[in-house]
Swiss-Prot record:
Membrane spanning residue stretches: 7-29
The keyword Cell inner membrane is annotated on this UniProt entry: yes
NCBIfam families in UniProt: ATP_synt_b, PRK05759.1-2, PRK05759.1-4
Organism of provenance: Mannheimia succiniciproducens (strain KCTC 0769BP / MBEL55E)
Function: F(1)F(0) ATP synthase produces ATP from ADP in the presence of a proton or sodium gradient. F-type ATPases consist of two structural domains, F(1) containing the extramembraneous catalytic core and F(0) containing the membrane proton channel, linked together by a central stalk and a peripheral stalk. During catalysis, ATP synthesis in the catalytic domain of F(1) is coupled via a rotary mechanism of the central stalk subunits to proton translocation. Component of the F(0) channel, it forms part of the peripheral stalk, linking F(1) to F(0).
Protein name per UniProt: ATP synthase subunit b
One cellular-component annotation, GO: plasma membrane
UniProt keyword annotation of Cell cycle present: no
Length: 156
């Protein structure tokens, strides 16, 4: 192999160029690459953290929705129970009122029956006395009439 000055010059130029690139060009390129790697890693970590935060938030929202549904169901159940209680109370009051009205009606009917019965006894007794007077043909005195009417009413 033949070494001449051109080859030595090229070797020196290549060595200087390599030293210059390693000393001045390579560090900024490496620094830019490392910054880019760091930026990408941070972005990926941030995205992963955001994804985890979103999943946590989604779980929290689902828990809140579930709790709200349970609370709404409790309110609905309470309202239904209250409605049933009110209906039962009204039904009981209506039954009591019905029983009271029926009892009152029976009492009124019974009182009216007794009054009519008593009135009828008095009329029957008066008619019996009148009939007896016509049959006998004479009038019994007033005191005797009242006595007879009272006895007849008591017997009827």
């Amino acid at each position: 192999m033949n070494l001449n000055a051109t080859l030595i010059g090229q070797l020196i130029a290549f060595a200087l160029f390599t030293w210059f690139c390693v000393k001045f060009v390579w560090p900024p390129i490496i620094k830019a690459i490392e910054e880019r790697q760091s930026s990408i890693a941070n972005a990926l970590a941030s995205a992963e953290k955001a994804k985890q935060d979103q999943a946590d938030s989604q779980a929290a929202v689902e828990q809140e929705i579930l709790a709200a549904k349970e609370e709404a169901q409790k309110i609905i159940d309470l309202a239904n129970k209250r409605r049933n209680d009110i209906l039962e109370e009204v039904k009981t009051e209506a039954e009591n009122l019905k029983a009271t009205i029926i009892a009152q009606g029976h009492a009124e009917v019974e009182a009216e029956r007794k009054r009519v019965q008593e009135e009828l006894r008095v009329k029957v007794a008066s008619l019996a006395i009148a009939g007896a007077e016509k049959i006998v043909g004479r009038t019994v005195d007033e005191a005797a009439n009242n006595d007879i009417i009272d006895k007849l009413v008591a017997e009827l």
